[in-house]
């Protein structure tokens, strides 16, 4: 009862009646409501001392219970979790904790647990109502030093060491919190946004929108509950389809970052530009359209084996990015033609058409280009989120 009282205040909205009504129509299921794919730290990324990370998380699905996954899948050392808590934020932005009590999370009955290198732990359910678009603060304390990968993404987070008198200061690193799931009687679909830095939200400045998947979640939130999909962002900056770039390749991490998401019904795959850009222009180190198409088909085969539909995203313009060239642009165009052919995926999201310049199709629209000619700015990411045909996400 104490949990219900606390988290009813945390949610800011009593959903008991809504949940009860929905329960009459469908049995509750666990569904992904937020995600952040694990990625390795670089050799130059700094080590953090024992301390606490605070993550501000926006849910994309409502439910009557929550479960957290804390991951060290790409870590370089074993970690010791000293404790995990959930609380309400003090305001519309930032990581300050509000006046409501802090709720302690347990893992198989324990507050403190070991998190070995390469492992993930899942919390016990928190039984209480949560609503769509609700922000919560998840605090993860480590008794050991940690080394998270750095990032330029706008996700709001802060860190404080365990030393006496230490205060929380903003930090830009990849979170150890990898998945938030909710139990819902109305979770008709769950979408995993899968890709590289463009999906990850690199250079995006809107902390809680976090790239085009956040804009997609906003659009879905406006639909009736019976049509509202949760959105889980599993983009990783630098990721590739065929080979390990940053973190495990798309084909290998499918099982970790897609299959493990509860209730996943759809994947929107936007990946391949790093394969093309990092490859050579010719010879054995060049990436050909046929190689990427093969990779896409392998990804789709994995998804279809689990009953998951895959929408293919066309690769966005990048001719003037540092690692591209006219030869590689021809490869991008050939890959996009194959994606648009409707012969690979269950549907297509034409991200390229959403952001390309009408006069120079190999470039982004100037108003969407922050200057690196590769990663769309917030306006461009919003246009990409608007490009998804919501009818393709019907269960």
Please place each PLM-identified region on the residue numbering.
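Bacterial N-terminal signal peptides that target proteins for export
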Residues: 1-9
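Oxyanion-hole/transition-state-stabilizing segment in secreted/luminal serine hydrolases
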Residues: 204, 236-291
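N-terminal secretory targeting modules
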Residues: 22-194, 203-207, 225
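Catalytic His-Asp segment of secreted/periplasmic serine-dependent ester chemistry enzymes
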Residues: 277, 316-395
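Bacterial N-terminal signal peptides
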Residues: 8-18
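Structural recognition of the beta-strand scaffold that forms the well-ordered cores
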Residues: 190-195, 199, 230-235, 265-271, ...
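Surface-exposed amphipathic alpha-helices with a cationic face
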Residues: 296-304
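Phosphate-binding active sites in nucleotide-utilizing proteins
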Residues: 208-238, 251-252, 257
């Amino acid at each position: 009862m104490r949990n219900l009282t606390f988290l009813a205040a945390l949610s800011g909205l009593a959903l008991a009646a809504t949940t009860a009504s929905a329960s009459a129509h469908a049995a509750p299921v666990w569904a992904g409501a937020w995600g952040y794919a694990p990625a390795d730290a670089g050799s130059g990324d700094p080590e953090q001392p024992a301390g606490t990370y605070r993550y501000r998380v926006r849910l994309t699905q409502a439910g009557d219970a929550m479960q957290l996954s804390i991951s060290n899948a790409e870590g370089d050392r074993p970690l010791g979790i000293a404790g995990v808590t959930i609380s309400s934020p003090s305001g519309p932005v930032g990581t300050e904790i509000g006046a409501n009590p802090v709720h302690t999370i347990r893992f198989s009955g324990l507050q403190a647990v070991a998190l070995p290198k390469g492992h993930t732990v899942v919390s016990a359910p928190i039984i209480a109502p949560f609503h769509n678009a609700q922000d919560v603060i998840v605090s993860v304390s480590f008794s050991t030093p940690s080394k998270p990968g750095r990032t330029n993404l706008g996700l709001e987070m802060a860190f404080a060491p365990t030393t006496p008198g230490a205060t929380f200061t903003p930090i830009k690193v990849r979170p150890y919190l990898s998945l938030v799931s909710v139990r819902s009687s109305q979770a008709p679909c769950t979408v995993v946004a899968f890709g590289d830095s463009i999906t990850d939200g690199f250079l995006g400045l809107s902390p809680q929108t976090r790239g085009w998947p956040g804009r997609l979640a906003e659009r879905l939130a406006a639909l009736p509950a019976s049509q509202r999909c949760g959105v889980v962002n599993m983009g990783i900056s630098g990721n590739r389809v065929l080979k390990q770039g940053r973190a495990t390749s798309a084909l290998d991490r499918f099982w970790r970052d897609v299959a493990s998401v509860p209730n996943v019904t759809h994947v929107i795959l936007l990946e391949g530009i790093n394969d093309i850009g990092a490859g050579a222009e010719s010879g054995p180190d060049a990436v050909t359209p046929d190689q990427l198409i093969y990779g896409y088909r392998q990804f789709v085969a994995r998804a279809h084996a689990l009953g998951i539909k895959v929408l293919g995203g066309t690769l966005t313009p990048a001719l003037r990015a540092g690692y591209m060239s006219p030869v590689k642009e021809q490869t991008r165009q050939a890959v996009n033609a194959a994606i648009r052919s409707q012969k690979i995926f269950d549907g297509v999201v034409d991200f390229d058409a959403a952001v390309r310049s009408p006069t120079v199709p190999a470039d982004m629209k100037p108003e969407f280009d922050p200057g690196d000619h590769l990663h769309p700015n917030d306006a461009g990411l919003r246009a990409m989120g608007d490009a998804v045909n919501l009818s393709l996400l019907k269960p």
